[in-house]
Amino acid sequence: MPETYPYMKGPFEPSFESLYNFHCPDWFRDAKFGLWSHWGAQSVPMYGDWYARNMYIEGSDQYLYHLRHYGHPSKFGYKDLVKLWKAENFDPEELMDLYVRAGAKYFFAQTTHHDNFFNYDSKLQPFNSVNYGPHRDIVAEWRAAALKRGLKFGITEHLGASFEWLNTNKGCDSHGPYAGVPYDGNDKRYEQLYLDNAEYLDLSKPRMHYTHDKRWPPRWYECVREMVDLFEPDMLYSDGAVPFYAKGATIYDPTYESGLKMVAHLYNGSAAQNGGANQRIYFQKDSRPEFFRIGLLDIERSLEDDIKPLPWQTDTCLGHWFYDVRAQYKDHRQVIGLLVDIVSKNGNLLLNVPQRPDGTIDEECRFTLEKIAQWISVCGEGIYGTRPYHVYGEGPTRLNADKRDKAIQSALRTLAPGATIYNREADAQWTPWDIRYTQKETEGKVYAFVMGDARAVSLTQLKEPEKVASVRLLGCGSVPFHTEGGVLSAYLPERLPCEMANCLEIVTRP
């Protein structure tokens, strides 16, 4: 009898205990900053996230938008919308040049979102970007462009949640001229896209992230294995906890079988290519150590409040996940502040750049990336290849989780049990006293990022300030300093090389 979940054998077994032998590769700890294309057919309306679900929820903003722009979802559904995605101006070579200039050391491409439409030449899902819409293998093109420039390449899969998420297309309007007329998701001819999940449609109940339907884990597994085998990614990201989390499940529960075998398959594939050493990373969002230690923890739009003993990653976006003409963007100052704060706490930042349906990014995104590129060209030395100092920083400003919004907090916990509280990412008001530290210990260097606008800087958290041999302002040169009472004082020129987060390189004597 064939295995339900065939996986490559090797040093990693499909158990939590075996996968605890994962060690984060140094390349990721050195890289610090990645960019992400969270892009697909849902970008067509340019009207935000979760469009393929919400267009079937009567009265929702996206339902009304769809009704007025495309027609009723019984007549013009998501199967029709995917055909409008053309990506006619998509130039991964030009975009990747920009992303490298902006400082990205790794890149993620989305293989499929919860919409169950695949962005590559899948042999398992006919509803894909080669057969419909662009008629291009989007993921393969991204991969080629990234590897050509020496970037590590990752894929994100959001398929685990699709079975529950994509059931709204089985409904119908409750009132109005189309009352009782089934949405097109009820048409069995399109079940490969819309799925056989009508029995789970009940909008009066909270939505589960992962289904309990026994048919779905094998389907998820064969599709994600296809992705891993096709693209041999350095990183695999699951949008949720380890599949297939169920409430109350322990690390020994068989509900995790498909997820654990996928991680073992991922790692053993790398070990086979690297003399037994795994160089790949699996990301998921359950922040309980007994679960996330099989890879690295990813916290969506969230931050940590102190240095973490293990590397971790925040993923966020300049605007909304999918292109939205209404979105208010982060500016370069906010992104730089996030990056420095995250790196000071042993983390990496993964930033999504929203793309229009034609494949381009807008001028606001381009401007932001160019400004980040200017900053990284000056201060990147204090970011790449560094490790946390004994403290992450000093000063009054804290970027940590916003615990006030209980609704958002509750929603995130349905995505991943034990998840770090959602952070609203309000733009920090950095003061002249705010400092963030990194170090290259083997080189005897500490880096102090002066987050606010300051000319006289006092550093109170250096381990041995009396051993400081020199202080250099990156992008400028040596600056005068003195130490007294355990405090190092440095004096910066009136004209600073960067508009924020200027970086001091502090070299100590042995």
PLM features per residue range, with description:
Residues M1-P510:
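Mature catalytic domains of secreted/periplasmic carbohydrate-active enzymes
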